[in-house]
């Protein structure tokens, strides 16, 4: 399926975006190995998260999925209650699922194979294989990419590990393995990354130690069931935040969005560019802060993106580059080589698409330079990347003509009702089927 977006006369209204994808992954995983029943409200029923649910069910976890209410009811099997799955666990398109499950499965008393779709089978896994091996895990793979064969070792040993780059997925993988390790596992990161795993461990009553740069867990503890309500995903909200910011006449409100400080890079950067964004009605539930976000149209200016904001914005850069494309002046983004090993090479995909829409965009080995200009209509390829597809749908709200985006099926991995909500606030997006994603 492809998308076609035509220029908007302005966005308006109030919407609630679906539950946070990162928190959904972690919540169901921890609930599955907790003792007792956990109800998860606001679970994201996207393909990536449902792949995690399926994997846990295949290992004996009882998970009732109430899809139309976005609710899971999880009967935890306890720390030692998982069973060997009957076949390889398919993580679909989800890098988060395969990396979190690798940490969980490294300390089990059985062997497992983790695999995924063709995109996932190109994603780098050396970053988790090396530290897990230091803990005593044995993992076979060809070329350090999936499929991964994990030979479970219930006698893992805790380690002190310095992450070479800020990565919430790697950090979380090692913390999960640390739950099953003898002694203490401590992870030090060079810059803050999203901390949902740490917050959820606390929510499930697991003791951990944390300072400014390090987080430690000791093995042998227990998780206790605890109901959780998942806030809206700021990565999904970001598409509407940018669309309203760049489209004249816009004013929208996004309700109950997660505003974890480790995820606020997109708001911080847009404000640096001149955006009119107001965050109100702060509450905190299940250790996670939530708020309403009001956005009005504003004229933007290009900026040099500070390195300390990169880990806080890593998933939102595709749509942030759309904002940069219509800002006055030049925007420079560096230190984001990680974007080249996402679902697709996001640097190359964004530069290619922006150039096709008339924007001067230059690819760097670790980033991009964009000279703000006027978006023209045209056709771009999402390269089967959900965030690229939605970013260019946002571009179409301000382009001089229709923007057509090819190969958008993977939007279902993170935002199944994107088109519905986009049209509700006036973005004029429609799905089109046919050759080449149209």
Curated annotation (Swiss-Prot):
<feature type="binding site">
    <location>
        <position position="169"/>
    </location>
    <ligand>
        <name>3-phosphoshikimate</name>
    </ligand>
</feature>
<feature type="binding site">
    <location>
        <position position="123"/>
    </location>
    <ligand>
        <name>phosphoenolpyruvate</name>
    </ligand>
</feature>
<dbReference type="InterPro" id="IPR006264">
    <property type="entry name" value="EPSP_synthase"/>
</dbReference>
<feature type="binding site">
    <location>
        <position position="22"/>
    </location>
    <ligand>
        <name>3-phosphoshikimate</name>
    </ligand>
</feature>
<dbReference type="Pfam" id="PF00275">
    <property type="entry name" value="EPSP_synthase"/>
</dbReference>
<feature type="active site" description="Proton acceptor">
    <location>
        <position position="315"/>
    </location>
</feature>
<dbReference type="InterPro" id="IPR023193">
    <property type="entry name" value="EPSP_synthase_CS"/>
</dbReference>
<feature type="binding site">
    <location>
        <position position="387"/>
    </location>
    <ligand>
        <name>phosphoenolpyruvate</name>
    </ligand>
</feature>
<feature type="binding site">
    <location>
        <position position="342"/>
    </location>
    <ligand>
        <name>3-phosphoshikimate</name>
    </ligand>
</feature>
<dbReference type="GO" id="GO:0003866">
    <property type="term" value="F:3-phosphoshikimate 1-carboxyvinyltransferase activity"/>
</dbReference>
<feature type="binding site">
    <location>
        <position position="315"/>
    </location>
    <ligand>
        <name>3-phosphoshikimate</name>
    </ligand>
</feature>
<dbReference type="InterPro" id="IPR036968">
    <property type="entry name" value="Enolpyruvate_Tfrase_sf"/>
</dbReference>
<comment type="subunit">
    <text>Monomer.</text>
</comment>
<comment type="function">
    <text>Catalyzes the transfer of the enolpyruvyl moiety of phosphoenolpyruvate (PEP) to the 5-hydroxyl of shikimate-3-phosphate (S3P) to produce enolpyruvyl shikimate-3-phosphate and inorganic phosphate.</text>
</comment>
<feature type="binding site">
    <location>
        <position position="346"/>
    </location>
    <ligand>
        <name>phosphoenolpyruvate</name>
    </ligand>
</feature>
<feature type="binding site">
    <location>
        <position position="21"/>
    </location>
    <ligand>
        <name>3-phosphoshikimate</name>
    </ligand>
</feature>
<protein>
    <recommendedName>
        <fullName>3-phosphoshikimate 1-carboxyvinyltransferase</fullName>
        <ecNumber>2.5.1.19</ecNumber>
    </recommendedName>
</protein>
<keyword id="KW-0028">Amino-acid biosynthesis</keyword>
<dbReference type="InterPro" id="IPR013792">
    <property type="entry name" value="RNA3'P_cycl/enolpyr_Trfase_a/b"/>
</dbReference>
<feature type="binding site">
    <location>
        <position position="167"/>
    </location>
    <ligand>
        <name>3-phosphoshikimate</name>
    </ligand>
</feature>
<feature type="binding site">
    <location>
        <position position="21"/>
    </location>
    <ligand>
        <name>phosphoenolpyruvate</name>
    </ligand>
</feature>
<feature type="binding site">
    <location>
        <position position="26"/>
    </location>
    <ligand>
        <name>3-phosphoshikimate</name>
    </ligand>
</feature>
<feature type="binding site">
    <location>
        <position position="95"/>
    </location>
    <ligand>
        <name>phosphoenolpyruvate</name>
    </ligand>
</feature>
<keyword id="KW-0057">Aromatic amino acid biosynthesis</keyword>
<dbReference type="GO" id="GO:0009073">
    <property type="term" value="P:aromatic amino acid family biosynthetic process"/>
</dbReference>
<comment type="similarity">
    <text>Belongs to the EPSP synthase family.</text>
</comment>
<keyword id="KW-0808">Transferase</keyword>
<dbReference type="GO" id="GO:0009423">
    <property type="term" value="P:chorismate biosynthetic process"/>
</dbReference>
<feature type="binding site">
    <location>
        <position position="169"/>
    </location>
    <ligand>
        <name>phosphoenolpyruvate</name>
    </ligand>
</feature>
<dbReference type="GO" id="GO:0008652">
    <property type="term" value="P:amino acid biosynthetic process"/>
</dbReference>
<dbReference type="InterPro" id="IPR001986">
    <property type="entry name" value="Enolpyruvate_Tfrase_dom"/>
</dbReference>
<keyword id="KW-0963">Cytoplasm</keyword>
<comment type="pathway">
    <text>Metabolic intermediate biosynthesis; chorismate biosynthesis; chorismate from D-erythrose 4-phosphate and phosphoenolpyruvate: step 6/7.</text>
</comment>
<dbReference type="GO" id="GO:0005737">
    <property type="term" value="C:cytoplasm"/>
</dbReference>
